Amino acid sequence: MASSPHQQLLHHHSTEVSCDSSGDSNSVRVKINPKQLSSNTHPKHCKYSISSSCSSSGDSGGLPRRVGGGGRLRRQKKLPQLFERASSRWWDPKFDSMNLEEACLERCFPQTQRRFRYALFYVGFACLLWSIYFAVHMKSKVIVMVVPALCFLVVCVGFFLFTFTKLYARHYAWTSLALTLLVFALTLAAQFQVWTPLSGRVDSSNHTLTATPADTCLSQVGSFSICIEVLLLLYTVMQLPLYLSLFLGVVYSVLFETFGYHFRNEDCYPSPGPGALHWELLSRALLHVCIHAIGIHLFVMSQVRSRSTFLKVGQSIMHGKDLEVEKALKERMIHSVMPRIIADDLMKQGDEESENSVKRHATSSPKNRKKKSSIQKAPIAFRPFKMQQIEEVSILFADIVGFTKMSANKSAHALVGLLNDLFGRFDRLCEQTKCEKISTLGDCYYCVAGCPEPRADHAYCCIEMGLGMIKAIEQFCQEKKEMVNMRVGVHTGTVLCGILGMRRFKFDVWSNDVNLANLMEQLGVAGKVHISEATAKYLDDRYEMEDGRVIERLGQSVVADQLKGLKTYLISGQRAKESHCSCAEALLSGFEVIDDSRESSGPRGQGTASPGSVSDLAQTVKTFDNLKTCPSCGITFAPKSEAGAEGGTVQNGCQDEPKTSTKASGGPNSKTQNGLLSPPAEEKLTNSQTSLCEILQEKGRWAGVSLDQSALLPLRFKNIREKTDAHFVDVIKEDSLMKDYFFKPPINQFSLNFLDQELERSYRTSYQEEVIKNSPVKTFASATFSSLLDVFLSTTVFLILSITCFLKYGATATPPPPAALAVFGADLLLEVLSLIVSIRMVFFLEDVMTCTKWLLEWIAGWLPRHCIGAILVSLPALAVYSHITSEFETNIHVTMFTGSAVLVAVVHYCNFCQLSSWMRSSLATIVGAGLLLLLHISLCQDSSIVMSPLDSAQNFSAQRNPCNSSVLQDGRRPASLIGKELILTFFLLLLLVWFLNREFEVSYRLHYHGDVEADLHRTKIQSMRDQADWLLRNIIPYHVAEQLKVSQTYSKNHDSGGVIFASIVNFSEFYEENYEGGKECYRVLNELIGDFDELLSKPDYNSIEKIKTIGATYMAASGLNTAQCQEGGHPQEHLRILFEFAKEMMRVVDDFNNNMLWFNFKLRVGFNHGPLTAGVIGTTKLLYDIWGDTVNIASRMDTTGVECRIQVSEESYRVLSKMGYDFDYRGTVNVKGKGQMKTYLYPKCTDNGVVPQHQLSISPDIRVQVDGSIGRSPTDEIANLVPSVQYSDKASLGSDDSTQAKEARLSSKRSWREPVKAEERFPFGKAIEKDSCEDIGVEEASELSKLNVSKSV
């Protein structure tokens, strides 16, 4: 473990350390990135590989080996491991974890059982056919040959019935071993009856056999085919360890040849002579080597693919679980800031952006590239905009009275803590009273009921919420020893709800009724709920209601000008004589809401309630006895101690979700932090109002599992890996996919094609895509490396068969035929060339030239690969057939060997499992049928009656008559006897080849499908994470989210932060509710705010954070990310960027107005910088905001500013003027709370007093304009939140490099901004003329100005 100074050194040099472990070996890769000393210095990244540095065993010495530097990194040319997590024991392919190995054997058991039953069917069927054959052709030895075969058939039936028992599932390996030994015994016993003389004699001079018609027995080719079948079954379906299979196979081959040779020579087989005997023994041994090589290859690749498929399917299941968690976390995250209905529509936008991101990063193959259409899609007129009008909605505004006095003697950090505590109580009340929290504006809190989902009791919900807030603040004062109160206003009407902008969005409501609800709060009385006459109509007489007495308190002018005669009421509580239960009183009296859905569905994450004990039932009865129901809201309450809240904690006045136990936790209250056994997500996903802080912390725990594993010490790595494996096994055991996956593969049972046509096309192009992408080879299961092994085996078998064929000529001292030499040379060239190409594809593809790489990519295609594969898989058979000439008629040994070699060539068609099994099996059938045809073809050119060389060797009653006779003494043809045996022999062997080819292609396709499923789930998870990150970035800044993962709150003081307020000052003139309640007006505002948000996407403005939009006011700040400011160079560089952003906003409005045709928006910007506090407020509907005197002054710079110009304070002027900006001195302006302040305007007027052309007209009147959408000025919402801070200008920027600022330009205009007709631009039902709109706008503006009042503190 590195010491602390070493850790500091690594951190100082930005060193990245990763631990890569595979199997029993581990390695550490260290990446050192020295800090840049200057902007012109670009140090090269160096990577070093330190072997065995984190291995629990092995030497750790050795010098580091540099594997990359300034040049291109080269792929390590080494043999990959068998499969992921493979043990180091190559002779026994298994996982390095017993948990994984046992789970794999258990999950693959249906496939193992199925294959074993197929083997029993095959063996039993072979016994039946051989019994029939022996009964017909060996009547004199029925007992010797037929009875054992029939007895073994009965044994196979017994084994088959045994496979249905549970005992077989526990001892299937021992069952396979028992069957193997029985098959060995039966086939070796048959060797005693091979070539037994019946009624004939052997002519030793020419090695021919003359016999009279009699019974026949198995020939040498027939017995060797049985040996091949036994060995193939041993390696492919018996499921014994490799070392045991190899040992048994070698012993069987030795005994088989020993018994066969012994009894052939002892009874009737003539000795071929010393030289020929050595050739025969060596040739037979080499043929057995070929069979064992093919069997080992099939065994290893079968194990590799089954275990790789198990891991892939298991990973797919794990990814599926992770996908559920990610989806739940994403839903919780977005539902914590907005309602579900709005969130669903917003997520579609995130899905589209994620899909576009995937497409940008995807690598398409040439076949998948589609020709671009010449028809271009029509440009989208507007950005995605979701806003709906809802009637009968109650709106509540609440303001903390006395908050300014309370905050006067508190620090900013303490103030954020108080707001979190108080708003946390309000959030809980809002949740339980079924209200929808909208946001907080400074010390103001507002929510709605009946929106976005309508409710008939919306008025009661808001009244209960208001009364609960008054009760809650009383408790707050008692606990905190403070003197504050609540002033609440409620109004009922129609609202527009939705989201404005593309970044830092939040759910909000707009309408004149919202402004009126805000006015009700401002005209209310502390400690009471001030409601309008519209709200009172929805209430009954359960509340103590009195007249609002607005005239007596505020005067006649307020009622006449602002309320316009609207009658109001004050509610102080419920009537004492009524027995109604108040939600607020119940919540604040130690009761908790019982979720009906949770009760009906049982424990979280379960569909039915789990059975409990008698004590649990008694506790449930006791709980129901203490239930309370609020008649106004229909909400049921229970005491917190009885509502399942045990184990929860109270933070910020809000109780956490109860934690339930799971099997993996090991106890009712056990928890695993940052571990693999994190609580299931289903336990925490029922509450849509969960704190976003908890979501981020939970997301960090899930995401931190893999990070923690790579950084663990070597001594703990094994323990952590065991826990990971145990968790992996537990997850897949609960899923039925694994069992169905192997037992019911998603493929067509006849053609073996995938049922999904798109998946089939993808499968056929997968090999080519792997070559195109030059994917690294990690395991034997890789498609390119698997092909390399197939080509290597094909070359090996071809060379061995060719050598055995050429050995005969050395023994007989005869030259080989020219045709055989030519075929051998051509075949060898093809094999070597294929081997070189395969090695090139696997290890050296990045080094080939472009033309060669194109050729390799073409070869990797589906059709070329099958054509080349068909040739390669047939080369051994072609080599054997090239040696069949007329000479083989005269020698029994050569003829028998040739037939045996053809059998090996047929078995070789089990190679190349990536190719179609139909193609390989068909070619094997053709090769076998070719040998049978030789029985009817004479190689003698002078004879009209032909004779096969095998006929002369294998017919016991044939007498050699060279070139002119092939008829037996009794007149029968040779093929009439020996042909039937060979037909049966090749039929059984081809049947086994067809079966194995089918099984291994299915296995290969399942392995590919497992990869696809795992990648698909991994892509979905990544998409979910991208969406969550996208949401997170649009809710709170990224650096703030990282902090919230480890703490419940966030607040930070900044010494020099820049703040701007930009208001569309004449939006109230543009806004009118005559059509769709003003929805289309807000669509236009959404477009303009979206243009502002797009500016933030530019790299030049990445240091600017959008804070929020307040109606038609846009608020942004800079210098809030300390780490980013330190990397930027000068500490005040962010102020220049923020000022350039403000200038660019002016230009955006100018461009926007050029396309408006009939209305010009006017932007007014206020700029200031200085110390401020940034923090996150609330437990639900989190809001990232900034406070401080700097923010207050920036807001006043906006409200007291000039249209189409930027107003800055004197301190900001000093800094910006040194950066090269010219200002006009405005004079002194009366700023609320600050008195007279000197301000400056940008841009500077020209000599003739005219503002530059790109600016709009300047209004000489300085008017304080409040927000037209909610009736609150940006200054009012944040004024006096913190004690005044003495402002002083600090270090200024005096560099000469920035004497002339460069203005950013918009790169392109939006396509929808082309001049169009007014009726096309705004679909208000008819064309809107400028004059009529101006008339309507003036009337509406005058009405709005009467409703808007400044908030008094």
Swiss-Prot record:
It is found in: Cell membrane. The chain crosses the membrane at residues 118-138, 142-162, 172-192, 216-235, 242-259, 281-301, 787-807, 819-839, 868-888, 892-912, 921-941, 976-996. Residues 359-374 have a biased composition (Basic residues). Disulfide bonds: none annotated. Residues 1-27, 51-73, 349-375, 596-615, 641-685, 1290-1314 are annotated as: Disordered. InterPro entries: A/G_cyclase, A/G_cyclase_CS, Nucleotide_cyclase. Residues 51-66 have a biased composition (Low complexity). Mg(2+) 2 binds at residues 399-400, 443. Adenylyl cyclase that catalyzes the formation of the signaling molecule cAMP in response to activation of G protein-coupled receptors. Contributes to signaling cascades activated by CRH (corticotropin-releasing factor), corticosteroids and by beta-adrenergic receptors. Insensitive to calcium/calmodulin, forskolin and somatostatin. Stimulated by beta-adrenergic receptor activation. Activity is down-regulated by calcium/calcineurin. The modification Phosphoserine is found at residues 610, 613, 688, 691, 706, 1257, 1259, 1295, 1307, 1332. Detected in brain, spleen, lung, liver and testis (at protein level). Detected in brain, especially in hippocampus, cerebellum and neocortex. Found in decreasing order in skeletal muscle, heart, adrenal gland, ovary and brain; and to a lesser extent, in kidney, liver, testis, lung, thymus and spleen. This is Adenylate cyclase type 9. Residues 1-117, 163-171, 236-241, 302-786, 840-867, 913-920, 997-1353 are cytoplasmic. Residues 16-27, 661-676 have a biased composition (Polar residues).
